[in-house]
From Swiss-Prot:
Transport listed as a keyword: yes
GO cellular component: Golgi membrane; Golgi transport complex
Lineage: Eukaryota, Metazoa, Chordata, Craniata, Vertebrata
UniProt protein name: Conserved oligomeric Golgi complex subunit 8
Membrane topology field: Peripheral membrane protein
Pfam families: Dor1
Biased composition (Pro residues): 580-598
Species of provenance: Bos taurus
Family affiliation: Belongs to the COG8 family.
UniProt keyword Phosphoprotein, yes or no: no
Any one biological process term the GO annotation gives: protein transport
Length: 626
């Protein structure tokens, strides 16, 4: 068993040895061949041709004799092959000629093909680009076709969207604002989803223009005589448009209503100041009250429930309304003051009553401005009175320039009353009839009484001091005029003229001035002045000349002209009337006290001027006290 197992091992080893030796022999033969035929046959050439390799290996395995005969055999084989080739060429020369021609033609055709291929290769890039463009255009055409097909299938829906601007414009122009707001909300949703589509952008822009037109129409409605329900609808639409904040909406509302009010006030004729201011009062009272009512019904002045967002400032919205009302009241007061300064005649009491009613109506909305009217009317009243007093002084001076002291029967009998004594109403003051003897004094008193009667229509107690001062200044000027007349005419006075001049001064100081004091006490009752100051009537003299002229001051410049008299200690009841107890306050609708109404005395035949009667004018409307 052991010997049997050994035999295959030795056989395998000998086979392996033989194969190895053969491989080594082939390697040696190849190396030998490579070194022998290095110059004739490159190694790469015979290695690539198997027949050359076999032949060389066959030669390397041949004997010496064979190697000697091999060149001859090769020469014979070569000669034989050459002969066969000649025979073949001779037998088939036509075929070879034809083949050569075909080969030449094929070469020529191959050249043409090569040239054509070159041109084709040169044109292939442009063809490739054209094909790409064609594919792209085909894809676009296909996409457009699909879009056109989709557009055709949804033609109705697209048409509705494209008609939105036209429909929006129709709704706005026909005042269908609710439908217009619904369309605007739908367009806003479209914009959020398809803002990149140009058609949608165009629709959005056209709808915005229609919304701007709608905004202008709504604000224009607020500039007309619109009622509260319509105001509520308009403000509701403006809030839905979400264009203004709450504060801006309030300002816009007030601006629009203010423009309407200004148009009404501008349309009032401005020729007659009284007509202009009465119509202005009526228009402001009615329309301003309506605007305030509308504002309070639409907007709430309560504090907001939620605090403002981050970055937003807290706006005092109630101050907007109060500031506007204050501005309107200020503008009305300016117009009132302007028209009063232009002059409204003797209708100041009627105008005061209308203004007071206007202010009273505004008290219901918390805008009572009656206190602002007092300075305006006081200033107008005192200015009118001062102007009338100044005109009276100028008129007195003109008459004194042409006045001559002439004795007349009326003068000599001045102590007696005229035959036809005028009849006066109870409670009125009768002017001194002795003034008829001296026309300048009579005319001066008449002018003063006209000023008093005009002042009586609107006579605040606060004007007592200014009226008294104005009257004192006028009397001081009259005194200077009298002194100037005396200096100019004294040298030419006769004894009779001197006596008449003394009577002139006496009547001026003892009749005219005390009568003016009594008129002042009727205009400004001492009891009323004391009640206003909150003092007893007996202490009124401590506060100066309130409501009466200081006669001694007026008398002092003329003292050297008057005759010397014994001092009398009894008080004249006419000069110092008994001060009544404070009168109870009158209700607003109570009639005013009886005015000072001078009576026209009889006029002598001597050509003296008549003392004009200045009866109280009848007011157009009941006046209210200040």
């Amino acid at each position: 068993m052991a010997a049997t197992a050994t035999i295959p091992s030795s056989t395998t080893a000998s086979a392996t040895t033989t194969a190895t030796a053969a491989a080594l022999g082939e390697v040696e033969d190849e190396g030998l061949l490579a070194s022998l035929f290095r110059d004739r046959f490159p190694e790469a050439q015979w290695r690539e041709r198997p027949d050359v390799g076999r032949y060389l290996r066959e030669l390397s395995g041949s004997g010496l004799e064979r190697l000697r005969r091999e060149p001859e055999r090769l020469a014979e084989e070569r000669a034989q092959l050459l002969q066969q080739t000649r025979d073949l060429a001779f037998a088939n020369y036509k075929t070879f000629i034809r083949g050569a021609e075909c080969t030449e033609r094929i070469h020529r055709l191959f050249g043409d093909v090569e040239e054509s291929l070159g041109r084709l290769l040169d044109r292939l890039p442009s063809l490739q680009q054209s094909c790409r463009n064609f594919v792209k255009e085909a894809e676009e055409i296909s996409s457009n076709r699909r879009m056109n097909t989709l557009t055709l299938n949804r033609h109705t829906e697209i048409l509705e969207i494209l008609e939105i601007p036209q429909l929006m414009d129709t709704c706005v122009r026909n005042s269908y604002y609710e439908e217009a707001l619904e369309l605007a909300a739908y367009v806003r949703r479209l914009e959020r989803k398809y803002s990149s589509i140009p058609v949608i952008q165009g629709i959005v822009n056209e709808v915005r223009q229609s919304m701007q037109l709608m905004l202008s129409q709504l604000i224009q409605q607020l500039r007309t005589n619109i009622q509260l329900p319509a105001c509520l609808r308009v403000i509701g639409f403006l809030r839905q448009m979400d264009v203004f904040t709450e504060a801006e909406l309030r300002v816009k509302f007030l601006q629009a209503r203010d423009a309407w009010l200004r148009s009404i006030l501008t349309a009032i004729p401005n020729d007659d100041p009284y007509f202009h201011i009465t119509k202005t009062i009526e228009a402001c009272r009615v329309h301003l009250f309506d605007i305030i009512t509308q504002y309070r019904a639409i907007f709430s002045d309560e504090d907001p429930l939620l605090p403002p967002a981050m970055g937003e400032h807290m706006v005092n919205e109630s101050a907007i309304f109060h500031g506007w009302v204050l501005q309107k009241v200020s503008q009305f007061l300016q117009v009132l003051e302007t028209d009063l300064n232009r002059g409204i005649g003797s209708r100041l009491d009627s105008l005061l009553g209308q203004c007071m009613y206007f202010g009273l109506s505004f008290s219901r909305v918390g805008a009572d401005f009656r206190g602002q009217l007092v300075p305006v009317f006081q200033q107008v009243a005192i200015s009118t009175f001062q102007k009338a007093i100044q005109e009276a002084v100028e008129k007195f001076q003109d008459e004194m320039n042409s006045y001559t002291l002439i004795s007349t029967p009326a003068v000599l009998g001045s102590s007696a009353l005229p035959a036809a004594a005028p009849v006066t109403q109870p409670g009125t003051l009768q002017p001194p009839m002795v003034l008829l003897d001296f026309p300048p004094l009579a005319c001066f008193l008449n002018s003063i009484l006209v000023a008093f009667n005009d002042l009586r229509l609107c006579c605040p107690v606060a004007l007592a001091q200014e009226v008294t001062r104005a009257l004192e200044d006028a009397l001081d000027k009259v005194t200077k005029v009298i002194l100037a007349f005396h200096r100019a005419e004294e040298a030419a006075f006769s004894s009779g003229e001197q006596e008449l001049f003394v009577q002139f001064c006496t009547v001026f100081l003892e009749d005219l001035v005390p009568y003016l004091n009594r008129c002042l006490q009727v205009l400004f009752p001492p009891a009323q002045i004391a009640q206003t100051l909150g003092i007893p009537p007996t202490q009124l003299s401590k506060y100066g000349n309130l409501g009466h002229v200081n006669v001694s001051v007026v008398q002092e410049p003329l003292a050297f002209i008057l005759p010397k008299r014994e001092p009398v200690f009894c008080l004249d009841k006419e000069l110092v009337p008994e001060l009544p107890a404070p009168a109870p306050a009158l209700p607003p609708n109570a009639p005013s006290p009886e005015p000072v109404t001078p009576v026209t005395p009889a006029v002598p035949d001597a050509g003296q001027e008549e003392v004009e009667s200045a009866g109280p004018p009848q007011p157009d409307e009941p006046s209210a006290g200040i």
